[in-house]
């Protein structure tokens, strides 16, 4: 699903995004996390600061929300073929976790400079990893090329309505607290 949104230099909020956020499937995999008062930070900034504890998610990041929502909303045919993405960190783990949960084949292209702990974390979820390029842009270019050649769905880390809607559930959760 692609939403047509005019690009005008600033992000335009849309009722369509709010509708997508309301219909997300993220709680099939994401945990409901608390909001905690940050005493030390509040003192330092002379203001009340609260933290949404997304570090308590299975991958220690909110990125699981967007990745899972996008992948869970693929067609059965797309899911059967598998997915591909590029990332050097939390998005890769979110995609790998979602694919394990949904039993979908997954290949993640990561720069050769990715810390070994991140690579191991992705492999722990059962995803295949290809190390390519010295930076994210090179890895991403390779992943997009491979997705086209193999007719796999490329899972965007941020520039996709379903990914944005999944990640937007953080705001929804904060508003209900």
Q: Which residue stretches match the model-derived regions?
A:
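PLP-dependent amino-acid enzyme catalytic core
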Residues: 1-176
């Amino acid at each position: 699903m692609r939403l047509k949104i005019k690009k005008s230099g600033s992000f335009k909020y849309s009722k369509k995004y709010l509708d997508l956020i309301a219909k997300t499937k993220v709680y099939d995999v994401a945990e409901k996390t608390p909001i905690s008062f940050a005493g030390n930070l509040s003192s330092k900034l002379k203001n009340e600061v609260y933290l949404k504890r997304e570090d308590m998610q299975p991958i220690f990041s909110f990125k699981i929300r967007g990745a899972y929502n996008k992948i869970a909303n693929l067609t059965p045919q797309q899911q059967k073929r598998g997915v591909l993405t590029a990332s050097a960190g939390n998005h890769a783990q979110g995609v790998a976790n979602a694919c394990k949960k949904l039993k979908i084949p997954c290949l993640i292209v990561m720069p050769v400079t990715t810390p070994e702990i991140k690579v191991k974390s992705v492999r722990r979820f059962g995803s295949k990893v290809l190390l390519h390029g010295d930076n994210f842009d090179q890895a991403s270019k390779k992943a997009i090329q491979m997705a086209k050649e193999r007719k796999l769905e490329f899972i965007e880390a941020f520039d996709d309505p379903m990914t944005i809607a999944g990640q937007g559930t953080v705001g929804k959760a904060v508003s209900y607290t």
